[in-house]
Amino acid sequence: MENETHYAEAVIDNGSFGTRTIRFETGRLAKQAAGSAVAYLDDDTMVLSATTASKKPKENLDFFPLTVDVEERMYAAGKIPGSFFRREGRPSEDAILTCRLIDRPLRPSFKKGLRNEIQVVATIMALNPDHLYDVVAINAASASTQLAGLPFSGPIGGVRVALINGQWVAFPTHTELEDAVFDMVVAGRALEDGDVAIMMVEAEATEKTIQLVAGGAEAPTEEVVAAGLDAAKPFIKVLCKAQADLAAKAAKPTGEFPVFLDYQDDVLEALTAAVKSELSQALTIAGKQDREAELDRVKEIAAEKLLPQFEGREKEISAAYRSLTKSLVRERVIKDKVRIDGRGVTDIRTLAAEVEAIPRVHGSALFERGETQILGVTTLNMLRMEQQLDTLSPVTRKRYMHNYNFPPYSVGETGRVGSPKRREIGHGALAERAIVPVLPTREEFPYAIRQVSEALGSNGSTSMGSVCASTMSLLNAGVPLKAPVAGIAMGLISQEINGETHYVALTDILGAEDAFGDMDFKVAGTKEFVTALQLDTKLDGIPASVLAAALKQARDARLHILDVMMEAIDTPDEMSPNAPRIITVKIPVDKIGEVIGPKGKMINQIQEDTGAEITIEDDGTIYIGAQVGSQAEAARATINGIANPTMPEVGERYLGTVVKTTTFGAFVSLLPGKDGLLHISQIRKLAGGKRVENVEDVLGVGAKVQVEIAEIDSRGKLSLIPVVEGEGDDEKKDDTDK
């Protein structure tokens, strides 16, 4: 019985876009894991997930030790890793972002107080190059965890839906996404009443959104995004049912796991009696550092009062203090509509925006919202400097690279600095997705763009601050964005009063409000539509009307922030003199060889002569980059002379260069690749009419000589005559007399 393989299937109906089948299987692979499941997408993409738990809890931890790892195996796409050792190394950015997509809905679904180490490892074993594996991995991870006998309130269904030709399509392919206006990953649980509790959303507009909207497609406004969340619910329900069917056949009974509650009720009651009034007072201080100093002081008073009574329970006192703080903050918001720093629920903190914040760089901007301070810095370079990707994705290069740094001093602490953590990679990716839809195309702006966001101060949503700083920095660097983008972080607090749930949406949340709220979501966009959205909630479903109102509230805030940013910069600046100048030239594909020359001789010569860097694409597009515009233009003129020549005509005059001498004359280069013969009989004119025995006596290689084309024969060979000083003027005079 133990070796029996069990299956369950979820069929997703996309109407005119056909069906997708997600098949779950357990009992065949990874049998020693507490729970293992394989998820197949159309029997072509395969993800194995294994969930294991430590035998003993880590009692000294004050958090739940859940680890999610995604292992991309290059054999899944029939590739050998491109690294020196030809072996997979550290996880790719795609893998790290998928880890976060799995962790976010899974973590809150475990029983509160669980302290056993839980590890979920999802391995991508087979991948159709047109499929996206991330949502398949969410479902596989949920299924394996559901089977593992853990205190887990799943299953969780994850689906990607994209708005294509006015229809929300589930599990779209890469090919289908090329026509999508909006793309979102939604994860949630099926509730007993038949509804779906949405737990996580990760969404973005696409590179083609603006082009598609201009062509008549529906813009991804807040209303459209809310409709997309509703469209995802039936798909999530089908996925949850398939996982539940599998669990009914093969799940282990839930084991006995010790739960370490943060505190007992007696500690909370004693703490409330001892310091509630002082704590309430401390929570009205507007400044973050002053408030935290006072909160620490009140916490010390609480410890002094309670420790004699609760000896050895210091951790409980600390946890109860956090819980009391949370309830007081929430109560004040619900009842008085007043927040920690004294703002109303829709108020935005003081904004400041400036460009050219640091010297010499190609573009920079400083954006401040309250105590959150972000420096955005833009660097431009040749397209050959774009990021080369060696992943399972069919995308092999990335022209816009957004890096986010969060140093410990941004919150006044010490800590490790160095390689980016998962959180930094996630925040950078969110800011990148917010900006990508408004970037100019490669043809319009042939540059690789690296954008760095430095979080210099943090108190609430540095990722959305990064979007604002990046927009201004890119404009300062001269990048012609299609529209400016701003972002805002929102929170939601709910409380039941007299049997009715009241919801309050908060605009521009602080770090503390993020921790104490029921939902936080970040929205970035232009004046017209949403470009990126990230949502996490602890609630079992948010009424559609509440979500719609919160999205509208976010839009109002975004428009206000855009106005402030536009006062600092509203159009692209002139490019920095320190930025390279890049121009393009298109040549016939059959001329590429001529431009390169034998063994690269011609292209190397052009680069050496002009100081420009040249990159040639297979379609005949040539990118020419140089530190000075005149160098790039010189290279373009030379390339055009070779590959797009204007055919010389009889009577045209050129200042040519002697490239070779023979016994019968000199070959003179007029244009790159165009030489003509100046016969020895014509060279006599340059020697005052005297007989010339040796061409070298009059013209050496490298000499400049003014010539005129006298004849072009049937094979295109050019015969030249010299233009002797004074001769040309006399001829013109004679013509006039005639």
Swiss-Prot record:
Domain of life: Bacteria
Catalytic activity: RNA(n+1) + phosphate = RNA(n) + a ribonucleoside 5'-diphosphate
Sorted UniProt keywords: Cytoplasm, Magnesium, Metal-binding, Nucleotidyltransferase, RNA-binding, Transferase
Gene Ontology biological-process annotations: mRNA catabolic process; RNA processing
Domain S1 motif: 651-723
Location of this chain's protein in the cell: Cytoplasm
GO molecular-function term, one example from the UniProt record: magnesium ion binding
Classification via Gene3D superfamilies: GHMP Kinase, N-terminal domain, K Homology domain, type 1, Nucleic acid-binding proteins
Domain KH, chain residue ranges per copy: 580-639
One Pfam short name: RNase_PH
Enzyme Commission (EC) number: 2.7.7.8
UniProt GO cellular component terms: cytosol
InterPro entries in alphabetical order: ExoRNase_PH_dom1 (IPR001247), ExoRNase_PH_dom2 (IPR015847), ExoRNase_PH_dom2_sf (IPR036345), GPSI/PNP (IPR014069), KH_dom (IPR004087), KH_dom_type_1 (IPR004088), KH_dom_type_1_sf (IPR036612), NA-bd_OB-fold (IPR012340)
CDD domains per the UniProt record, alphabetical: KH-I_PNPase (cd02393), RNase_PH_PNPase_2 (cd11364), S1_PNPase (cd04472)
Cofactors: Mg(2+)
Binding positions (Mg(2+)): 514, 520
Similarity-based family: Belongs to the polyribonucleotide nucleotidyltransferase family.
HAMAP family according to UniProt: PNPase
Purpose of the protein: Involved in mRNA degradation. Catalyzes the phosphorolysis of single-stranded polyribonucleotides processively in the 3'- to 5'-direction.
Name under which the protein is recorded: Polyribonucleotide nucleotidyltransferase
Gene responsible for this protein: pnp
